[in-house]
Amino acid sequence: MSRLAIAAVTLMASAATYAAEPIALRDMGSFHVGGRLVEISGKPVKDVTFTPGGVPAKVDPNGTYQVEQMYVQYFLPQNEKGAYPLLLWHGGGLTGVTYETTPDGREGWLNYFLRKGWSVYNSDAVERGRAGWAQYPDIFKGEPVFLTTSNPFQRFRIGDGPDSYDPDPAKRKLMPGSQFPNAGYENFVKQNVPRWTTTDDATIAAYIAEIDRVGPCIILFHSQAGTFGFKVAQARPDKVKALIAIEPAGVGDPAKVDALKNIPTLMVYGDYIERDSRWPKIRATGGAFADAISAAGGSADVVDLPKVGIKGNSHMMMMDKNNAEVAGLIQTWLEGKGLTKK
């Protein structure tokens, strides 16, 4: 077993004591960032009754709207040990809840890294959660995409193949040795929110605005945010000190890979990649981009968790039962790159 895997196991063994220890903060808060103003005209004025039994009010939809902003909540530990703030970016159809807690009520990565002394900035991206979304098709083009309860069960490599989901947890067909907390799956899908496929440019602009406000930072991003994380780093290479890509569904601009050569990069992939028709291609795309970073003179480490003895992880590894073990591997990598304070 590699040094990273051994260290991760040690960290997992001590993680059980965390819940009894309070988290000491020097500050916490939130802000919105990014966005733009848009004019809408030519719409009819309507009478709207906002509250049952209330008095109707005239609502004129014509005018200026604030849209495409992003919400960020930050937590600053009393005893800061990270050399730079850690930004957490969620994946598609999700929000910052991804990192807050697990479907079965355990601590998420937000708390894990806070306890390790990192200042953590957790966001709801454009058109997600507390960022809000805009009218469509007037502003957002196309319709939002909604997922059924069963869709992520197979697509996120929790269930083993088609028809693996069942409303009864006991009847579900899980991947063999799955670490996902099956009994809490419905709590996970309650986190799912509508997503658009036409807002990438706005999302990248908002993430750039976040970095411009926060300053030099480390970005940990998941799934859909793979494209955002790499492209934002390519746009602000002087402000990004490390990239941690958790099963990135997309990558950056191959023509601008040189911009990443001074940014240490870690890619992490879970289990069962070969058991799903989509994931081998996604994994190959990420690996090829890591190779391109290395060829440009950069540092890109790719970790397939089963190969270092960490097995059973789904696409949602930050929620899996061994999430502290995976976080420990990331923490060890950050320490090895000199990104913690002495």
Functional labels for PLM-detected ranges:
Residues H90-T102:
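Active-site glycine-rich loops that stabilize anionic/oxyanionic intermediates
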Residues A245-L305:
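The feature captures the conserved acid-bearing segment of alpha/beta-hydrolase catalytic domains
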Residues I310-G312, M316-K342:
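Catalytic active-site module of serine/aspartate enzymes centered on a nucleophile-bearing elbow/loop
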Residues G82-G92:
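Short beta-strand element of the alpha/beta-hydrolase
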Residues T197-I218:
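Conserved acidic catalytic loop of the alpha/beta-hydrolase fold
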